[in-house]
Regions:
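Extended catalytic cores and adjacent scaffolds of nucleotide/polyanion-binding enzymes
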Residues: 1, 10-158
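Anionic group-transfer/hydrolysis microenvironments
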Residues: 7
Length: 158
């Protein structure tokens, strides 16, 4: 799992960092819950489960996100892997974020995906994944009907 946030302005990089931290905490939490369901959470304790890249027009920060899992509590952290400037050293690091991200997808992601698949395959069959119905309609279908989009979609499908 990976996210990237790009911002501009005086505190842009910090805002991008916070948004990435939020997104990756949700993703890491989902992985932790999956591994808890199959009683294998020790496999991912303190392991990087997600990456994020935050940048503005000048600087880049690359983080790894992980969880410290105790019996009663899980705490989420991020680890700064690399921080650099695009323009420093005559642009020497201008491809660093790209190379890092490509390596994540080429090397790490396949192993991580296999680990997730094994956990999904080990889910107990008696788990109930049903979602309770919404108390109120979302308003999406009503909004589409009122704008005649449903009819347009139906016509384009035929």
């Amino acid at each position: 799992m990976a996210t990237c946030e790009v911002k501009c302005g005086a505190v842009a990089l910090d805002i991008a960092d916070r948004q990435n931290a939020h997104s990756m905490t949700l993703a890491v939490r989902a992985v932790v819950e999956l591994f808890r369901l199959v009683k294998c959470e020790k496999e991912i304790h303190r392991e990087i489960l997600a990456f994020s890249v935050s940048h503005d027009h000048r600087s880049v920060r690359i983080y790894g996100h992980y969880a410290v899992i105790d019996v009663a509590k899980t705490t989420f952290y991020r680890h700064l892997i690399h921080e650099f400037s695009f323009s420093a050293l005559e642009g020497k690091e201008k491809w660093t974020a790209h190379k890092f991200t490509k390596n994540v997808y080429d090397a790490w992601m396949l192993t991580h995906f296999k680990r997730l698949c094994l956990a999904v395959n080990d889910l107990p069959p008696e788990l109930d994944f049903s979602v309770p119905p919404l108390l109120q309609g979302s308003g999406l279908s009503q909004g589409l009907a009122s704008h005649h989009l449903l009819q347009s979609l139906a016509e384009s499908a035929s």
